[in-house]
Amino acid sequence: MLPAGDASDGEAAQPPACAIVLVSNGPGELSTWVRPLAERLHALQPLRPRDPRAACALRLVLVPCPNATGQEHRVARDWGLFERVLPAARFWWLLLRPRRHGPWPARGVVVFLGGDQFWTVLLSARLGYRHLTYAEWVARWPRWNDRIALMGPAAAGRLPRRWRQRAMVVGDLMADLSDQARQDEPLPAGDWVALLPGSKRAKLLVGVPFLLETADRLAALRPGSRFLLPVAPTTSVRELLAYGGPANPLLRGRAVGEPRLQDGELITPAGTRIRLLERHPAHGALSQCTLALTTVGANTAELGALGVPMIVLVPTQHLEVMQAWDGWMGLLARLPLLRRLVGVALTAWRMRHRGFLAWPNISAGRAVVPERVGPIEPAQIAAEAADWLDHPERLAAMADDLRSLRGAPGAVAAVAAMVRGLLPPA
């Protein structure tokens, strides 16, 4: 649906003359790539829906992704940045019959910001729009791109020489996150520890009780520690409370109490208070944390971009965590007859062959942040976190290392300028 406008205003009711179509997939890309670029584009020129009379509309198309939660389109709609948001479930129908999803202007630009790059090749060809790809590591279809924005020299080196005139190294889109985040409201003084258990049910089943117990133990070791937990847009406070209590099937048979909610804080049965952040993205608060305890995934990329030291946790004692992984291993882990037999073997194989799991480590090719994989326990992680907090110079060194990987800000502005350069003249 188009946003409602003044029905008596003929100019406002006119369809847009062009469209900028951002294409993405999972929740991490939406918060770290799509939203900053969309905000920048709105700041640079009039765009619908913020300006109903604008000649150009900003739209979002989501593509299939095994890591998606299915709620990304609702999250993006709430931002108020896009005239239209198309869920991933309708992507194939968009390719087959685009007119069924509303009128599409004759001219426009398709921008790849996550997923499989081939989807934007197909979509730009189907709509007859120009095409720009933001490539982290490799631009796979340079022949069918009008422009290519590259994250760094490594991606540029992988591009065939004949296509390099179309490309420009812009930097990491997430490098702007820290500067933007620090404009938000400051947290009260203290050593804040962020708890990030994940966004999907399989990870939350394991991550929430693990991190709540870790917080209890860390609070006992360091009573001055303060805790916050960003509530993923794909879950709710009520669900978090259920994951942390006896309703969690992984906790059956254990004498566990019920966490409760009071004044925007989750209070564990042991009395530890954890501030819940329902604003998304929570970059402002996260950027002020001294340390983060997080699962694998896009969380590690966001924390790295914000320069927040972290310990990355992959507890493998519950097979259910395997169901949150993508690809054939996650599918096998869901099979009721096979998952018990193959679970241990799959976990061992992945941990042996995958290498680094945290994005800062993958990007650097070395251990920038600690990864704790295996049958880890909350007491072990609490002791390690306390040791890090007792040595602020080590935390500062990790933060400096993360900032050096992030690179200089400015990528969002550079990509926005490339998008505008592909638009038809006004």
Name each model-derived stretch.
Residues M1-A426:
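Nucleotide-activated sugar donor-binding and catalytic core shared by glycosyltransferases
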